[in-house]
Amino acid sequence: MSISYEETGRRSQKARTRAALVEAARELLTRGRTPTVEEAAIAASVSRATAYRYFANQQALLVAAHPEVETASLLGMDAPSDPEERLDAVVTALARIFLDAEQSYRTMLRLSLETGSDRGELSLRKGRRYLWIRDALAPLRDRLPRAELDRLVHAIAVAIGIEALVTLVDLAGLSRRRAVEVMRWSARALLRSALAESAVPTR
């Protein structure tokens, strides 16, 4: 079984070097750049050869530089019980996460669309959006059949993701504030439609 470079000797020093490379990449991303391993190495004052021991390619670096949001819920301790209010709070919080690190999220979106990308890590990160939506809709677990709830989660995920934000801003020409308003409206509309549909008796 092979051992990674970072797991051999001088781990503290290697952890600091890796952190410096990641921070350099994040700083470059905030400036609108899509940093290569070489560019991050220069910015972090690390040799090119050393940088490649930590990140084999640009994608590995960019995945590491992507901001981590580890929380299992975007709702606070005093979260409302109403599903629509909960969903709106999650959409608003998620939009703020996107806007605070927009360039990084745009980069991850581009990577996910590139042919030949390693989708394992990318898919794992995108999956958090679904967890947060399910958390918002938790009060509906006993109200909607599992299949209908799953369909609603998928529909909302499409309407409020970074993909939606990029489309509304870049293609529709909306301001970011207006784009977020549309995302919130879309989520509410989908929820109300699902609830109305479930209330209609089947023949």
Pin down the residues of each PLM region:
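HTH DNA-binding helix-turn interface
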Residues: 52-63
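Amphipathic alpha-helical segments used for helix-helix packing
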Residues: 65-69, 99-120, 134-135, 166-167
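Key DNA-contact positions within bacterial/archaeal DNA-binding proteins
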Residues: 49
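Hydrophobic alpha-helical connector segments
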Residues: 43, 75-103, 123-126
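Basic, helix-initiating cap at the start of DNA-binding domains
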Residues: 1-46, 59-60
